[in-house]
Regions:
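Short loop/edge segments at beta-strand edges and connector loops
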Residues: 143, 186, 272-274
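Donor-nucleotide binding loops and adjacent catalytic segments primarily
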Residues: 200-205, 209-285
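Extreme N-terminal starter segment of soluble prokaryotic enzymes
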Residues: 8-12
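A nucleotide-sugar donor-handling region in carbohydrate enzymes
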Residues: 159-221, 250-254
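Active-site and donor-binding regions of nucleotide-sugar-utilizing enzymes
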Residues: 77-176, 181
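Conserved N-terminal ligand/cofactor-binding loop architecture of enzyme catalytic domains
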Residues: 28-110
Length: 287
């Protein structure tokens, strides 16, 4: 075992729990590498903002949901400002200087054969710190935003960028990445989503849902968006047509508790964070 570990290639994923998609994408990539290469590849995931960032970046995971839900204008302002090329260049340089102590510590503690970023804020300053310590170790970016991706995702110096869609691929080329380094790879998904699925009836039975038409309402890992009013509208419509609604609230425990206490007009099933999403999707007629 020690000999295998010594010979294994080491891949380190740079992520942060600002939303559920970044960690999920890293897990999907690590799962695929294990299926393809077994113990020949060892994967590690590092929440770089939480463990190596200074305040307020170190609390980004805790701040993310309140920011998006309660101060969305500020979140949109940040995205808009980051899309201004010169402004973002200044921010990236400032972050490099501001966070260099933690970045150097991360680079020293996590040597690897490949670094993969699955987070928009981890493609510039971390790349700089890693390139200084390991000048020949490749660095890749896998974009986990679907339809569009803000400028922080695009570092023309990375060795490979995997775009989630053709629009993101075009944006990467406009940002200065050479065509040979841009791959149209799509979104990473866990193998369970691609495997053969149970029938809706089988999935509903496994989840102890009633055997009736089912709509599934999702808000991502953090349970974001207008889930509560949408659930109210859907529940009323489905009740009048003999259907049922399942609402997955993710890590938003306040929302889950609130919805679970409500009196619904029909069959409504409320869950928090789940690790069997393929089964829930198989049970649904509408997502």
């Amino acid at each position: 075992m020690r000999r295998i570990e010594a010979m294994a290639k080491r891949v380190v994923f740079l992520m942060s729990d600002t939303g559920g998609g970044h960690r999920a994408s890293a897990h999907a990539l690590a799962e695929a590498l294990h299926v393809l290469h077994g113990d020949a590849v060892q994967c590690q995931m590092v929440d770089l903002l939480t463990h190596y960032g200074t305040w307020p970046l170190s609390h980004a995971g805790a701040y993310y949901l309140p920011l998006v839900e309660q101060h969305r204008w500020l979140w949109r302002l940040g995205i808009g400002c980051s899309n201004q090329a010169r402004l973002w260049q200044a921010v990236a340089l400032s972050a490099r200087l501001w966070q260099r102590g933690g970045l150097r510590r991360f680079a020293a503690e996590y040597p690897a054969d490949l670094y993969v970023s699955v987070h928009p804020l981890l493609n510039h300053a971390p790349w700089w710190a890693l390139r200084r310590r390991y000048p020949h170790t490749p660095f890749a970016t896998v974009i986990t935003d679907l339809a569009s991706a803000p400028r922080p995702w695009y570092n023309p110096a990375v060795d490979l960028l995997s775009a989630s869609c053709s629009q993101v691929q075009a944006a990467a080329l406009r940002a200065g990445l050479p065509p040979a380094r841009v791959l149209l790879g799509g979104l990473p998904i866990r193998l369970a989503f691609a495997a053969s699925r149970p029938t809706p009836a089988e999935a509903r039975a496994a989840l102890r849902l009633e055997q009736r038409p089912t709509a599934l309402l999702l808000g991502g890992g953090e349970g974001m968006g207008a889930l509560e009013p949408t659930a109210a509208t859907l529940a009323a419509r489905l009740a009048s047509q003999g259907g049922q609604l399942a609402v997955i609230c993710g890590r938003n425990e306040a929302l889950r508790s609130r919805l679970a206490r409500q009196r619904w007009p029909g069959a409504v099933h409320v869950a928090g964070y789940v690790d069997n999403m393929p089964l829930w999707m198989a049970a649904a007629d509408l997502v």
